[in-house]
Every structure is written in structure tokens, then in C-alpha cells.
Regions:
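A structural signal for short coil/turn segments at secondary-structure junctions
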Residues: 17, 53, 133-134, 157
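Nucleotide phosphate-binding/pyrophosphate-handling subdomain across enzymes
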Residues: 1-86
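Short glycine-/acidic-enriched loop or helix-start segments at secondary-structure transitions
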Residues: 5, 70-71, 98-99, 149-152
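Short glycine-rich anion-binding loops that position phosphate/pyrophosphate groups of nucleotides
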Residues: 37, 64-66, 93-95, 143-146
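A glycine-rich beta-strand to alpha-helix segment
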Residues: 125-156
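A short, gly/pro- and small-residue-rich
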Residues: 104-112, 152-161
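C-terminal helical cap/extension that packs against the catalytic core
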Residues: 78-136
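Short hydrophobic segments within beta-strands
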Residues: 61, 90, 140-141
Length: 161
């Protein structure tokens, strides 16, 4: 490739889908979707959000991805998510896995640091939650199917602005 071809390509490059993907960005409300589904990725997202929005309440709705990953990293997930002001945990997205007895989102919930507002919700109730609440900065985290709700979440929140 020539330098000019690269320049032209960069002009039209829109970034990676679902990596810190802003859907709404106003003074009153920020909504973004992030594919982060590993504690290190969540840590980086939480760190960036905390730096960008120092004086704003940051809420994450997180859907853990895989029972084995949740079992192996629940403390790390809790540590990374504890950088945020509020964490709303959905049920684990199983993908290709069968449930593992005793492995649920509650493992993460129980290990969130004191001071973090926390709750658990079924994915099917997320839209009702978004309708009933006001948010400052809201990030939808995970690699599961919670992302399917993002267009409707965006629509609901835009009607509130």
C-alpha cells in the first residue's frame, strides 16, 4: 500500500465495533457498549471511563460470558468492576457451555468492594430497568447477547433526553 492509500483508508476507518462504542454522548447522558468480557479488558474500560468522567456516576450492566471464565476469574471481575460506581449483573451467558453448579453471577456480586452499588437482574428485565431509572454514564459490558438490547436501550434513553 502507498502512503496515500493508507491515508484514505484511515479517513474512513470507524474503529472496532463494540469496543468503547459510544451510542449517546451528551452533557446529560452517556451510553456506550463494550465487548469487554475478561477482567483485564473490563479494568481498562473502567479505568478509561473513570478518567473521562471523573465527577459522574458510572453504571455498568455486565453479562458474564461463560461459566468456566466466571468460575476462574470471579474475584478479578469483581475487582475490575469495583472501579465503577454501580454494577448491575445479569445471568451468565453460557455460549457453548453447560451450567456449573454453584457458578453464577452472584460470585462476582458477593466480591464487589464495599461502596459499590450493586444489583442482579435477569437480562429480560433490563429494558424495564432502563425505562424506570435515570443514568449518568451507562456502559453495557460483555460478549454475550445483552448487546442485542443496546438499540432499544439507546432508543429509550434518547426519549428521556
Amino acid at each position: 500500500r502507498t502512503a496515500e492509500e493508507l491515508r484514505q483508508g484511515m479517513k474512513t476507518y470507524e474503529g472496532v465495533v463494540r469496543r468503547f462504542d459510544f451510542k449517546i454522548k451528551t452533557d446529560k447522558l452517556v451510553l456506550l457498549s463494550d465487548y469487554a468480557h475478561h477482567p483485564k479488558e473490563i479494568y481498562q474500560s473502567a479505568k478509561s471511563l473513570s478518567e473521562l468522567y471523573k465527577n459522574r456516576k458510572i453504571t455498568a450492566i455486565f453479562q458474564p460470558h461463560l461459566y468456566t471464565r466466571t468460575r476462574d476469574f470471579y474475584k478479578d471481575f469483581a475487582d475490575s468492576l469495583s472501579m465503577l460506581d454501580e454494577v448491575i449483573l445479569c445471568d451468565i451467558y453460557p455460549a457453548r457451555e453447560q451450567p456449573i453448579p454453584g457458578v453464577t453471577s452472584k460470585l462476582i456480586y458477593d466480591n464487589l468492594k464495599p461502596g459499590v452499588e450493586k444489583s442482579m437482574i435477569h437480562k429480560e428485565d433490563v429494558l424495564d430497568l432502563v425505562r424506570s431509572r435515570d443514568f449518568d454514564v451507562l456502559v453495557i459490558l460483555g460478549a454475550g447477547d445483552l448487546d442485542n438490547y443496546v438499540p432499544e436501550i439507546e432508543k429509550i434513553l434518547k426519549e428521556k433526553i
